[in-house]
Regions:
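Acidic, turn/loop-rich segments in luminal/extracellular domains of secretory-pathway
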Residues: 1, 6-8, 12-81, 85-183, ...
């Protein structure tokens, strides 16, 4: 860059002169003071430069003088954008628009003013600018659904047309542990007469937080009437004693599931006992005495049956086996 012409006053007419500069960034070539190739001056760090130029004539005599080179400021483009905050907690409600953080700009020109605009990025549609704030509007944030947003912001230097800088930002959603929402039991029916310790079913938990672990407990509360009849081992519900449909056909229990951070939900369950047809246990005859000489076909007595299954009907037959010696003398009607 040419700065200016250098001339010297010398009483010796026709003398020739060479020039040197005490600052290596400058040189005098052909009587012109200029910057050495590859050098530049920065107004913001050095608004003026003092140089000493020495003129030497052909006879070796010299003269020097100090000059001040004034650096003229040129508006420069911004070089960076910063965002004061780039993370938001899960469950934050952004429905009405929420400021993520404040935008600031790095620019060599002190005192410059700037404007900002959303110009791109995968999630540009949910962002806007308010003053120097980056604003998001995307309802209630859910880490499990979307854990980060990408937006491109452009800053424009108000002091000069076309002086801009663009930067991409990633706004992250931080996970917040949420309580379990649903407790389920894989099976709630059990045949009567199964052995004590039989597994009814397995518990499972629905939770928005992927990878959570859970513990299960029988707890007091509405619907806990028959908690004492069961034990939970791991995620298995086991019955403590062999159930009998005729004694109790269903059981009510209350269970709590708790995640690793102590958040929980409770659910009541009804375990239904399936009725199984059981064999009769007692066969009785209402009378077993008969007078001699009664007519053939006289009724000796009536059979009745004891059976755990209420309402069962029965048929009766004479059968072969121990004690059947006189079966042929009787008929069952």
């Amino acid at each position: 860059a040419v700065i200016g012409n250098v001339s010297v006053t010398d009483p010796d007419a026709g003398d020739t002169h060479t020039y040197s500069v005490d600052d290596a960034r400058f040189e005098v070539v052909g009587g012109v003071l200029r910057l050495v190739a590859g050098q530049s001056l920065d107004f913001e760090t050095e608004p003026s430069v003092s140089v000493i130029i020495t003129a030497t004539d052909a006879g070796g005599l010299s003269y020097n003088e100090a000059f001040t080179v004034t650096v003229t400021n040129v508006n420069e483009a911004p070089t960076d954008i910063a965002l004061s905050n780039s993370s938001l907690a899960e469950n934050t409600d952004t429905t009405g628009g929420l400021a993520v953080g404040n935008l600031s700009t790095t620019d060599d020109d002190a005192g410059d003013t700037f404007s900002y605009a959303v110009v791109g990025g995968a999630d540009a549609a949910v962002f806007s600018i308010s003053g120097n704030q980056l604003v998001i509007t995307d309802g209630v944030l859910d880490f499990e659904t979307k854990n980060s947003y990408v937006v491109d912001v452009e800053v424009t230097d108000q002091g000069g047309a076309g002086l801009t800088f663009t930067k991409s930002f990633t706004v992250t959603v931080t996970n917040v542990n949420e309580a379990p929402t649903v407790l389920a039991l894989s099976n709630s029916n059990l045949d009567e007469n199964v052995a004590a310790g039989t597994t009814v079913g397995n518990f499972s938990t629905t939770d928005a937080d992927t990878g959570d672990t859970f513990t299960y407990n029988l707890v007091a509360g509405v619907g806990d009437t028959d908690n004492a009849a069961f034990t939970i081992v791991g995620d298995q519900l086991q019955i403590n004693a062999s159930p009998d449909f005729e004694s109790q056909s269903s059981y009510d229990i209350r269970v709590r599931t708790t995640d690793a951070d102590g958040l929980s939900t409770e659910q009541t369950f009804t375990v239904t006992i399936n009725d199984l047809n059981e064999a009769p246990t007692v066969l009785s005859l209402s009378n077993s005495n008969l007078d001699e000489n009664v007519v053939a076909g006289t009724t000796v007595g009536n059979f009745s049956t004891t059976d755990a299954d209420t309402g069962d009907t029965f048929t009766y037959n004479l059968v072969a086996g121990v004690g059947d010696t006189d079966n042929a003398a009787f008929t069952i009607v």
